[in-house]
Structure formats: structure tokens, C-alpha cells
């Protein structure tokens, strides 16, 4: 069973874009997932194809109309997966949420523009609001591509080795350890000796230690959650 992705956007020509290349692109070719870009503007009913209007209460910018957006959703939503609105105020996308979304048979993503989308259609449709970070983009298209790339990688058979996924940043609650390849010496910099020792347990221990060190230094928020989870697990095992 493949994932069906539907993207509601004012710029359908932006898709698949980078998703048509590399891992996600190969998965498209093999049928692991599909993508349909729906032009929201085609659901406008006036001769100017108007999709936005000025906000009630005043203020800068324009707001996407609920009637137009809802018509696009009604015509395009497969009905068996979450409706997602990409917005800076949403739940922050993390690996746990990516894993959750990867279990869905379909994902319908609404890409906002201007000042955003009329709140009424978001409430009416019970949309899941997701953010890819604490910054503002010109629209939701780039965010949709980020979300889909993260999700597609977790689909069965898309990434060759399960170990590749398990070792990545965030999968174990830690940032990923450093990687090295040939040549063994480059510009006076050598590969850590333990990695060429052939001792698998020592290599594993080194990688774990580096992951912990990097996480503690660069992402103290992740480190705190990791320590709390590990402490809770240790207590549970001791009961």
C-alpha cells in the first residue's frame, strides 16, 4: 500500500520539485508514494479567480478565503488521512510526528500564502497545524516539501537498510555521531583510531559517546528529554 500525498497550493508547478529526485524521487518511480498538486485558484468562483481578501478588523496583508479553500479540500481530500495546514504557529515537526504521519494512508497538505488562511475553514475541517521551525516562510510549499521528504524516507522499502534509519539523528533521541570515510588521512586530519580497529563493540560505544556529547552540547533540550526518558526506563526496569 503506497502513501498518497495531496498538496493544496497556489503554485502547483513547485511540485514535485526536489521530491522528484534522490530517495523520494526513486520512491515515486517505484510507486511507494504518489503526489498530486492541486491548484487552489481553480476553485475560485469569480472571473478574476480571487482566492484572498482583506482581513476583518484591519491589518496588513490578505487572508485566503474559507469558501475557496474548503472547495479545494472537498474536491481533493481522499478522506482517509490527516488534513495538515503548514503554519509557524503549529505543532513543531519532529521525528516522532514524522513516524506518526508515515503510518497514514494519505496526507493532504494545505500551503498557505499571504497572511494565512481564514480560521473558520481550519476549525471546520479540524486541520492539524504543523510548523517546521520557529521562522516565517513566504508560503507553505517549502514546508510541505520538508515534511513529505521526512515522511517518505520512513515508508517501507524506501531506504535500503533499516540500520540507516535507526542510526540517524533523533531516532534514538540523540543527534547523530560523526561519519568518516576514505582516505584515512586528509590534510593532516586522521580518522579516529577506534573506527579502524575492527572491534564492533568499541565502535558502537564510541558512536554512542559522540552522540551523547554532541546532543548535550548543541541541543540541551533534546539531552534533557533523553536523560529523563533513560532515567524513567531505568526506574521501570528496577521495579
Swiss-Prot record:
Homodimer. Its main location: cytoplasm. This is tRNA (guanine-N(1)-)-methyltransferase. One of its GO terms (cellular component) is cytosol. GO terms for molecular function: tRNA (guanine(37)-N1)-methyltransferase activity. Keywords: Cytoplasm, Methyltransferase, S-adenosyl-L-methionine, Transferase, tRNA processing. It catalyses: guanosine(37) in tRNA + S-adenosyl-L-methionine = N(1)-methylguanosine(37) in tRNA + S-adenosyl-L-homocysteine + H(+). S-adenosyl-L-methionine binds at residues 112, 132-137. It holds the Pfam family tRNA_m1G_MT. Specifically methylates guanosine-37 in various tRNAs. Belongs to the RNA methyltransferase TrmD family. Coiled coil: none annotated. InterPro entries: Alpha/beta_knot_MTases, tRNA_m1G_MeTrfase_C_sf, tRNA_m1G_MeTrfase_TrmD, tRNA_m1G_MTases_N, tRNA_MeTrfase_TRMD/TRM10. It is found in: Cytoplasm. It comes from the Bacteria. Disulfide bonds: none annotated. Its EC number is 2.1.1.228. The lineage of its organism: Bacteria, Pseudomonadati, Pseudomonadota, Alphaproteobacteria, Rhodospirillales.
Amino acid at each position: 500500500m503506497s502513501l498518497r500525498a495531496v498538496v493544496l497550493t497556489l503554485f502547483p508547478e513547485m511540485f514535485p520539485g526536489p521530491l522528484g529526485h534522490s530517495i523520494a524521487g526513486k520512491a515515486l518511480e517505484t510507486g511507494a508514494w504518489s503526489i498530486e498538486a492541486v491548484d487552489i485558484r481553480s476553485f475560485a468562483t469569480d472571473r478574476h479567480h480571487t482566492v484572498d481578501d482583506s482581513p476583518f478588523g484591519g491589518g496588513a496583508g490578505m487572508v485566503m478565503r474559507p469558501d475557496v479553500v474548503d472547495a479545494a479540500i472537498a474536491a481533493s481530500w481522499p478522506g482517509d488521512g490527516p488534513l495538515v495546514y503548514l503554519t509557524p504557529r503549529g505543532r513543531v515537526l519532529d521525528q516522532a510526528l514524522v513516524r506518526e504521519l508515515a503510518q497514514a494512508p494519505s496526507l493532504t497538505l494545505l500551503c498557505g500564502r499571504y497572511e494565512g488562511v481564514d480560521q473558520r475553514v481550519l476549525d471546520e475541517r479540524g486541520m492539524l497545524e504543523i510548523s517546521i521551525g520557529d521562522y516565517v516562510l513566504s508560503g507553505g510549499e517549502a514546508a510541505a516539501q520538508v515534511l513529505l521528504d521526512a515522511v517518505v524516507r520512513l515508508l517501507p522499502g524506501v531506504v535500503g537498510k533499516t540500520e540507516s534509519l535507526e542510526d540517524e539523528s533523533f531516532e534514538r533521541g540523540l543527534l547523530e555521531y560523526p561519519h568518516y570515510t576514505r582516505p584515512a588521512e586528509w590534510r593532516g586530519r586522521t580518522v579516529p583510531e577506534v573506527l579502524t580497529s575492527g572491534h564492533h563493540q568499541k565502535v558502537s560505544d564510541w558512536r554512542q559517546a559522540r552522540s551523547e556529547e554532541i546532543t548535550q552540547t548543541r541541543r540541551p533540550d533534546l539531552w534533557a528529554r533523553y536523560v529523563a526518558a533513560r532515567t524513567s526506563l531505568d526506574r521501570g526496569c528496577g521495579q
